[in-house]
Amino acid sequence: MARVLGVLLCLLALFSSSLCLDHANGRGDQALAQINVYETSLALDSSVKLHASPQVLGSQGEDTEWVNLAISNPKPTSDDWIGVFSPAKFDSGNCWPTSGGKEKTPYICSSPIKYMYCNSHPDYMKSGNVTLKFQIINQRADVSFALFSNGVQEPHLLGVSNPVAFFNPKAPVYPRLALGKNWDEMTVTWTSGYNIDEAVPFIEWSAKGLPARRSPAGTLTFNRNSMCGNPARGVGWRDPGFFHTSFLKELWPNREYIYRLGHDLVNGSTIWSKNYTFVSSPYPGQDSKQRVIIFGDMGKGERDGSNEYNDYQPGSLNTTDQVIKDLKDIDIVFHIGDLTYSNGYLSQWDQFTAQVQPIASTVPYMIASGNHERDWPDTGSFYAGTDSGGECGVPAETMFYFPAENRAKFWYKTDYGMFRFCVADSEHDWREGTEQYKFIENCLATVDRKTQPWLIFIAHRVLGYSTNDWYGKEGTFEEPMGRESLQKLWQKYKVDLAFYGHVHNYERTCPIYESQCVNNDKDHYSGTFKGTIHVVVGGAGSHLSPFSSLVPKWSLVRDYDFGFVKLTASDHSSLLFEYKKSSTGQVYDSFNISRDYRDVLACTHDSCEPTTSAG
């Protein structure tokens, strides 16, 4: 009976935690979710004029352009707003068939891809004659701009602009690199409007100075029926295009390669992207400088100021820009969950891949699964929340490559030089006896610490330690059943660092085991491994999460600000940790680990190999 009661209490804690996190993470703050699309009424006004220019975008191959929207409205109000629609035709003719509910078909059935209040221009309320600037990316369809009055809950459609379109709306765009399953393999995934019956996708690539060669690409997509619920199946749905992945194999270590995306059309012509470059991975254990960026919960921003609501993702562009600025000193990036915060509005995935393209096209962009990618009731996720907006993992698992055995089970291991990364999936059960637990132990157990001394554990939710406000109120300082399930593995296999997102701030613990600091140093750790350092690095972009007023001894550094972590391995014995502010790029927290192979082998707290007294 006591055991049953214990299980029930654990489950209660789990689901109460999920509810708390839904509130704390601002579920529903997705800007597009504020628009009550189905309540739109037609109120066309012939005196309202809208003109968008230029009408042809990307004539020189660009995938991003600025559009000027000239507005003339003789009766401006503070509730007027512009919706940007793509495809440009957005009336009831595009409505998804439904079996019931509404007495009549609504005039609009799909969300805009972005929106902006007209009074964001200071002169709008004075004259109603202004020009707004919108940044438009290539999303495989034409674009129109619509003026609405009466706010976003019961919008009145007053007028629609002329359409604008990219010269080639189907062009290959937004390449994103990822490590393959072997160290000498790089994968390239990109988006286009070409299905395989229209064009054959491939990568043309070469080491600098050598002849180019081609590697074929596979093609995937998904449809509305792939979504698990609304808004992803309803107003948030937008055709995602096609996703192509090519595997570049047998790469030389640490060599620069040039590549471009290609599609051979059925008419015999070829569509090309511009040229990109990357540097291949070092050989596992190679002694060279290796630099890693880690952050979570970045989301996306709009450089034109649109889609601003409730300060939802205020740090996203700063983090992106700082990483781009430092890109020559970065080798690989880990974005550990809550990628876009699209929450069922599919257009946001294109906008996210466009935002991170300068990073992801140059260095491997490795991802983890978060609640905003995966969680939906009765779909196999560990949490019964609705944070994915009905996406249930499909866009993340399809649009990005990661070297998992089963893409629906978002856990994987990957090696980069002197690093071994074990990436867990906190949205699936990780407890002892589960398939994922066995993966985690295997990942930790199979690394050769002689050649790869730096062992890193990654998960989205905080399976270790955090003094975030809601964890503090629960008294757990963690995701329920997190460290209780995994700490003996971290200790046994001597995990150097464990990283988490989900909580939108920065926090670092002492080297810790069973909630006790096992080392009193703060900025330099040397000698025998004693315990794992746990780091929350979920402050990359989404609105910040407050800390608890309780500060346990194990919490060494906290920062209520946006930032990211950089790891620099100089050799097999030296690792530099830096936490940088997204706003300035300045280092706010840092420490060094100095550890030789014998220090990893040495016996310490619950991580001793059996011995015998026999001679």
UniProtKB/Swiss-Prot annotation:
Q: Which cofactors does the annotated protein need, by name?
A: Fe cation; Zn(2+)
Residue positions annotated to bind substrate are N371, H502, V503, H504
Binding, Fe cation? D297, D338, Y341, H504
Coiled coil residues, start to end: none
Gene Ontology CC: extracellular region
> What name goes with this protein?
Probable inactive purple acid phosphatase 24
Q: Does the keyword section mention Iron?
A: yes
Cross-referenced InterPro entries: Calcineurin-like_PHP_ApaH, Fn3_PAP, Metallo-depent_PP-like, MPP_PAP, Purple_acid_Pase-like_N, Purple_acid_Pase_N, Purple_acid_PPase_C_dom
Family that this chain belongs to: Belongs to the metallophosphoesterase superfamily. Purple acid phosphatase family.
Complexes and interactors: Homodimer.
Per the UniProt entry, the glycosylated residues are N129, N267, N275, N318, N592
Localization (cell) = Secreted
Binding residues annotated for Zn(2+), in chain numbering: D338, N371, H460, H502
User: Which interval of the chain is the signal sequence?
Assistant: 1-26
Single GO MF annotation: metal ion binding
Q: Name one Pfam family in it.
A: fn3_PAP
Which species is this record about? Arabidopsis thaliana
Q: How is the cofactor bound?
A: Binds 1 Fe cation per subunit. Binds 1 zinc ion per subunit.
Entry keyword rRNA-binding: no
The protein's predominant localisation is secreted
Keywords on record = Glycoprotein, Iron, Metal-binding, Secreted, Signal, Zinc
Question: Which tissues is this chain's protein expressed in?
Answer: Specifically expressed in flowers.
